[in-house]
Amino acid sequence: MELNNIPKYSIRGLNIWGFRDMAHFLDHIFQREQVKTGTMVAINAEKVLTAEEDTALSTLLSDAEYLYADGISIVRAIRRKYPDTEVSRVAGADLWEAIMERAGKEGTPIFLVGGKPEILKQTESKLRAQWNVNIVGSQNGYFTPEERNAVFERIHASGAVIVTVAMGSPKQEIFMRDCRKIHSNALYMGVGGTYDVFTGHVKRAPKAWQNLGLEWLYRLLSQPSRIRRQFKLLKFIGYYYSGRL
């Protein structure tokens, strides 16, 4: 696959990019010392189902340039609907770290948004120490609706080329959409709880679980309160086996 000819696969009306691996995704984003612009959103089965019930979220996802297969359920759905495809799972937390490492090497200006104040500070410190990331500004997730435009203006004034937003869905998608109206020439990435994972405050599943596609089960065992959310995924399983993907 050429870097500018990446296939897209339709799953329940969402067009998901088919990157064959992490390196392929990174090479597409960082081309000729320039970073692609647009909005990146991680897609899993839960987000697909939520978008079917939430018109506003569906519109946000449709408007985003990069929907990528974060969940193993999405990868398997694509492979079932489109046999012989090379698409692979690209976990959002891993992708964010890879982008930060690459940005550090190239001196790309980064602006961080979201998270608790102390978590954000730890994230900044670790990024600078680990990869010499050029962080040109940050804003924790505790700001009022009245302060949003001021945050947008700060991001614009910083000259950030990559903006990562950790506010949870759909708040982060809404934030990225609105911020792009002020600062359009940047790559935006919604990262959920990635800062918490990066700083060690939340544990990810062991690599063996991740490689088996069982990270969702690990999270469920660690957080039994997620059981209702997992029951919701039975609907996606129904789509999978009935050929309604």
Curated annotation (Swiss-Prot):
Reaction catalyzed: UDP-N-acetyl-alpha-D-mannosaminouronate + N-acetyl-alpha-D-glucosaminyl-di-trans,octa-cis-undecaprenyl diphosphate = beta-D-ManNAcA-(1->4)-alpha-D-GlcNAc-di-trans,octa-cis-undecaprenyl diphosphate + UDP + H(+)
Swiss-Prot/TrEMBL keywords: Glycosyltransferase, Transferase
GO molecular function annotations of the record: lipopolysaccharide N-acetylmannosaminouronosyltransferase activity
Keyword Glycosyltransferase: yes
Enzyme Commission number(s) from the entry: 2.4.1.180
CDD domains named among the record's database cross-references: Glyco_transf_WecG_TagA (cd06533)
Pfam families referenced in this protein's UniProt entry, alphabetically: Glyco_tran_WecG
Gene Ontology terms describing biological process: enterobacterial common antigen biosynthetic process
Similarity annotation: Belongs to the glycosyltransferase 26 family.
Function text: Catalyzes the synthesis of Und-PP-GlcNAc-ManNAcA (Lipid II), the second lipid-linked intermediate involved in enterobacterial common antigen (ECA) synthesis.
PANTHER family hit by this protein: PTHR34136, UDP-N-ACETYL-D-MANNOSAMINURONIC ACID TRANSFERASE
Name by which UniProt lists this protein: UDP-N-acetyl-D-mannosaminuronic acid transferase
Record organism: Photorhabdus laumondii subsp. laumondii (strain DSM 15139 / CIP 105565 / TT01) (Photorhabdus luminescens subsp. laumondii)
Upper classification of the organism: Bacteria, Pseudomonadati, Pseudomonadota, Gammaproteobacteria, Enterobacterales
Gene: wecG
